[in-house]
Every structure is written in structure tokens, then in C-alpha cells.
Amino acid sequence: MKKKKFKIALAQIKIEQKNIEENCKKIFKKIEEAAKENVDIICFPELATIGYTITTDELKKLPEDFNNTFIEKLQEKAKFFKIHILVGYLESKTTKKSRDFYNSCIFIDDEGKILANARKVYLWKKEKTKFKAGNKFVVKNTKFGKIGILLCYDLEFPEPARIECLKGAEIIFVPSLWSFNAENRWHIDLAANSLFNLLFIAGCNAVDDSCCGKSKIVEPDGSTLIEASGTNEELLMATIDLEKISEVRAKIPYLTDLKK
């Protein structure tokens, strides 16, 4: 039986560019902080392990196993603290023909099991020169209901959130690195996708010289449940009540009136 109420946290952090070791330490520390607050699910920003500025040449120089220890420790933390974890990270996939990099989000449950690995589908501008695009939108069934994942620019198209909604998503997490000059779109996109699909959306952003912060959780009617500052690192926490979805959908019949 799924839990109708649960506590989530968005870890709005400053990411140290290209410093995997320090970023991982910060991620583990935030997980421990969240556990002390009895958080059920914690989400981190996009590319939280390495940042956004790494070049194609620098990617190629990374060792093949640079993620292995990090993911193993994430699984250990999830199991030890009994917490679900979503982290945006740099994924490396090597085949006989090539080595590809993805802008991904790993989702680990409170038993340390990897539930999903979502890859960013829509790549923003020069990201196309560094990363390979994903090809599906992920929704996973959990003890907290059905959880969807989108990464940053995926949110700027109406189809991804609608696809996840039609797959049954009740809350969508959006790990992001959202810039200052697009802050107005951040607020609009989160609210609009939430309202049009009548579900919760949790957007987790970073804070630094280019990211606007303002991590926020949006309710099924598009209203803001809670919002972080634009400059400070913080653990933004709130209780999600899934009953609000049915309440809002009873008042706003978008999905029942949707022409299939």
C-alpha cells in the first residue's frame, strides 16, 4: 500500500565545477541532514557530481570507473538512512564502438536498489556536443506512488510531463541547472506543467554564478507549496499529500475531458 503523505527535500547546493570528490562529499552530507529530518525522498540538482562547465576533451580523460564508488556509496547511504535518493550526475557508457556520456539522474530506493536511471532527452544548445540524448521518459512505481523524472530542459516542452502524467505519475522531480536569464521561464514552466497535468512537480536547482536557485515544489493546481531563495544553499523540505491530486482533479476536469 502506498503512503498518501510523505516528506521530500530538495537539496539546493552550490556545485564545485569539475570537483567530483568535493561534490560527492556534499551530497552525502545533505543526505545525512535530510535523514535527521525524517525525509523520505531527497533530490539533488542536474549534474550535481561534476557541474556544467566540463569540456568534451575533459570528458574523454575521465577514467572509465569514475562513477562506480559514488553510486555504491549512494546505495549504502540510501539503505542505511532508509531514504529514497535522486541525483543528477554524469553517466559514462562504454561499448565496443564508442564511449558515450549522458546527462542523467539516478533514482535509488530506501533499500539501496537502483529503481531507475533517467537520461535527459532534450539537450540544451552546446550540450549536444558533449552528451548523447536519452530516448524515454521515466516513471517508477514506489511506496510513495508513481514518481516521474525530467531533467531541466525536458520541462520546457509540454509533451514530457504529459507523457509521464498519462503513465500515472503523481509527482515529477526535475533536477536542473537553471540560469538567471531564464528564471521567469523556471516559474512558468513548473507551474504550467503542474497545472496542465494536475500533479506535483518538484524542481531542484543549484546556486552559483550562473544558476538562479529558487528550487520549488508546486501543487497540482499550479500554486507554489514552498520555494527556496535565489542565492543560498538550503534543504527545502515539505510534506506531500497525494490526496490533493484527486481533490484538484475533481474540480478541474482537464484529464477527464482530454481527447485521446
Show which residues each predicted segment covers:
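CN hydrolase (nitrilase-like) catalytic-core segments centered on the catalytic cysteine
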Residues: 66-86, 155-234
